[in-house]
């Protein structure tokens, strides 16, 4: 397998996904909804239940849980857009006749979707860390964000993308 071709296809796919206004709108509105929900559930002024702020793992866990829901919607949207874009003419003419096999092509496209989802996940974790530090009474532990990213968000992304 040629990793240069995989990187090229992944970069092309991630740019294509980020330029899609429907995907971008749903992703940004989903991040805003997650931010508002977390602020309402775990903020200082709106804390609904004590168990949502008593543990240092509460804020990163709720963030990972809400992001997994958003991630499932985004993967469905990205794969449906993938199929419709390939049916339309002139969207992938530069790559349609390709000097690489289909495994490289599918790996690159899946990696492109994964890169976009990982960036959105990092942005969601940064927003949750901001809530945790500045707007919540919950204790902060930065390693828990990494833990829930590795044990919840990343495996969910692998499962949803079909790897």
Locate the predicted segments by residue.
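Hydrophobic, small-residue-rich alpha-helical packing segments that form membrane-like cores
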Residues: 10, 14, 96-99, 135-136, ...
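Cytoplasmic juxtamembrane interface segments
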Residues: 1-11, 83-93, 159-163
